[in-house]
Every structure is written in structure tokens, then in C-alpha cells.
Amino acid sequence: MGIINGKEFIDRLNKLENEIWYDGEKIKGNISEHPAFKGIIKTKSSLYELQTKDELIHEMTYCLPGDHNRIGLSYLQPKTKNDLKKRRTMIEHWARHTHGMMGRSPDYMNTVMMSFASSAELLKDKENCFPEHILDMYEQAAKHDLSFTHTFITPQVNRSQSYFGLSEKPISAKVIDRTEKGLMIHGARLLATQGGLTDEILVFSAPKFFFETDEAYAFSIPSNTKGVKFITRESFVLSDSSFNHPLSSRYEEMDSIVVFDHVLVPWNRVFFYDNVEAAKDFMTKSSFHAFTFHQVVIRQMIKIEFLLGVAQLLVDTINVSEYQHIQEKLSEIIVGLETIKALIDKSENDAQLDEFGYMRPCLIPLQVISTIIPKLYPRFTEIIQLIGASGMVTLPTENAFDSEIREDLDQYLQATNTNAEERVKIFRLAWDLTMSSFGTRQTHYERYFFGDPIRISSRLYTSYPKQEQLNMIKTFLHADTEH
């Protein structure tokens, strides 16, 4: 079958009839028409449409040997550095189309599945592990251009390291039975971004201090599997107006709690279960981090380009480019952007073949980006707020410009080089990016995208090779003092 277009994505999603609860009510009818979801579904469909365009199809898709059906390039298992460059080009195309605002664009989860398949052999001959199921799922996903969400975070009942989930009824999703047909899962998982808006949901074990056997599993099931419900938060879509809410009306992804109510996971969908070692080691020893970090930081690079553009447009609109403190603030963004670009280049240039014959980008530069992004992104949004100042809160709506007060607005909200309506449109973009409920969620999302920033820093420290530097200092200290 191969790649799908935008209409096929929407039609398939509507037919699933996933159980989604919004504001205490179960959604009925086509999910693509619901006010809280139609914006992101339309945007997502445009991504699928993008890969079918004649001018992009060879940069967004590829064919397997002997097969004329085109497959999304996000499923490509890279075997050369040139393959990594191809993947980067594809990721950049999709990220630029959404200005980096869609954290769960299809290529993210496609990359996750690709990384699992590329390292499936790690599970070979391990107890209760089925690497062949991962490979089959990967093949089906690529063949049918399936969309995925994932969930692995447990409910925040008690976050102390010594906490055990000993409640009578499961809170965190657990295996409560093993039957001839498959695993029985009951409980909840937190944070499935775009939960209910995809074909499949990938579920795996969260990193934790103590692992219980009944929580050591990984599987993928259709989002409309009986007993799976997605309970969403309040939508940040405040209107359909691209003037009033230029970003949230397009890119509000929605986040969900996933409830598993005695859900049967067929054996052919189980990747592993009742194996604490696999739950602890597969994510860290596989190519998961290398390939997913590569996708994520490219998207974040594009997003920071967008922030730089918005910041410069504000500067031009209110004519403050001559001030050195403004130049310094914009330079902060430029330095961050160029640093990230250079680190991505280094990760690709230093890529090496792994034990399974796949070209992994060097992880250290990607870890450096993941360590600085939680600091850089909030700072860059703050810079936009500081530049905009009071202009970020004195923002009339689109309707105000179609009312009898239009003359007042034109007079008092004009800018040096543009009219009042255009000025407000620019400032509303900056506000939606940094100060609206959508914008603050974006900041929070990037701050915690890879997990706790402290743990990310700790992981970088423990994995960074420091012996060469230590040897250099020891050699210096023991050098002959006469020389």
C-alpha cells in the first residue's frame, strides 16, 4: 500500500471511532469535525499530503528493493551517513511545515518504531521477549503508513523512589492476567500526546527506581481496542480564528490520560512482558535514544528558527533594532540556534555503524542539545516577551477591526512601518507563541521533552568519556619539573 495522503488519514481516523472523552462527555461522530481536534487533524492531514507532492516525494519517501510502493522516509533504517542526511532532510520538511510546533508529528513515532526494529535482536532468546513481533509491527506500520502515539509515564500518586504501587486496584497500568489469547492490562498511563488521534498506541515501561514484574512490558495495539479510553485535558483552542490564535488554532495537539479497562493485548502485539531486564535495558541499549533524539532536535532547531523570526519581526515592527540590549537578546537566540545546528552536524559526521549494521548518529552531541534546550527555550520565549513588553497584552481581537472602533484602533495601535491591524496580528502571534495557554504548554513541553532536566544532565555526565582529559592532567602533574 505505501504512503497515504491527507484525506486517507482523516477517513481512516474517523472510521476508528476511538473512545475519547472531552470535558466529561464521550465524543460521538467524526473526530475530525470536533472543535477541539479539527485544527490539529487538518494540520496533520496536510503533513501526509506533503509527502505525496511531486516536488517532495523523493525527499519524503523511498522504495524497498523490488517494491514500487513508496514508504515514508521516517521508516528508513539508515546504513550510511548519506541515509542520515536523507532522514534529516525529510524531518526538516515536516518540521518547517508546522514551524516545529508539532512535537508528535508522524515522523517522531515512526522513528521510534524504526529504532525498535533496528535493535530488536537485543531481545533475541530472552525470556518472554518477542523481537519478531517488533519487526512485524514495523513492517505493517511502514506498509500502511500507520500513525502512532505512545505512553509510558505512570500516574503521579507518589513520586518518591521507595514507592511501591500496592493499592488493591491497579493505578498504574499493569498485567493482571496472562491468558491463551494474550495479556490482560488494567490501570492508567499518563501523557499520550495526540491520544485518540492515531491508528495505534505504543505502550512501554517507564524508567523507574524499582521495577515490578507486572509493569515490565511493551506492546502496540490499535487505538480503538476495546477497553482503551482517552481522557483529554481542556483544549487550548480558543477560536478558529487564525488572526486571534494563529498557532493554537492549527497546532494544539491535545494530551490525554490513557485508561486500560481490562484490555486484552493479543500475543502477536506483545514485544516483551514479565521481564524486568528487558524493561530496564532495551530503551538504553537500543538505538532508541540516538534516532529519536536526532528527530527531536532537528524539529527543535526549526522551532528556534521560528522564534528568531518572530523576535526579529517584533523588533522591526516597533523599530528597536538600534538598542544594544535588543541586539544582545537577539544574539542569544542566534548563538543557541547555530550551536544546535553545529551539534546536529557533528552527530551526523561522527555517526558509526552499530552492532546490527545501522548508522547511528553520535549520541553525545544530541545529549548536549537535550541538556541545553530546557534552559534555552524558556529563555528565548522570555526574550520575545521582553521585546514585546506592554504590546503583548494590549491586543484587540479580529472582530474589533470590523466594528465602529476601527478608527480608534487604526490611530492608536499603528506601528512605524505597518498599520494597526497588521501590528496586532504580529503581536498576537508572539503572544500565542509565548504567553497563551498554548504557548506556555509549548514551553513546558520543551522543558520536559526528554524527561527531568536534572536527570538528563546526569545522564550526559555519566556517559561522557572523560578519561582522555583525566590522563592529560595526570601527565601534566607528573611531568619532569626541569622541563
Swiss-Prot record:
One example GO MF annotation: oxidoreductase activity, acting on the CH-CH group of donors
Enzyme Commission number, as recorded: 1.14.14.9
Alphabetical keyword list: Aromatic hydrocarbons catabolism, FAD, Flavoprotein, Monooxygenase, Oxidoreductase
Residues noted as binding FAD in the record, renumbered to the chain: 150-152, 156-159, 193, 452-455
One of the GO biological process terms: phenylacetate catabolic process
Pathway: Aromatic compound metabolism; 4-hydroxyphenylacetate degradation; pyruvate and succinate semialdehyde from 4-hydroxyphenylacetate: step 1/7
Protein name (record): Probable 4-hydroxyphenylacetate 3-monooxygenase
Superkingdom of the source species: Bacteria
Residues where substrate binds: 104-108, 150, 206-207
Role, per record: Catalyzes the hydroxylation of 4-hydroxyphenylacetic acid (4HPA), leading to the production of 3,4-dihydroxyphenylacetic acid (DHPA).
Gene symbol of the encoding locus: yoaI
Family under the similarity heading: Belongs to the FADH(2)-utilizing monooxygenase family.
Catalysed reactions, as listed in the record: 4-hydroxyphenylacetate + FADH2 + O2 = 3,4-dihydroxyphenylacetate + FAD + H2O + H(+)
InterPro entries linked: Acyl-CoA_Oxase/DH_mid-dom_sf, AcylCo_DH-like_C, AcylCoA_DH/oxidase_NM_dom_sf, HpaB/PvcC/4-BUDH, HpaB/PvcC/4-BUDH_C, HpaB/PvcC/4-BUDH_N, HpaB_Deino-type
SUPFAM superfamilies xrefs: Acyl-CoA dehydrogenase C-terminal domain-like, Acyl-CoA dehydrogenase NM domain-like
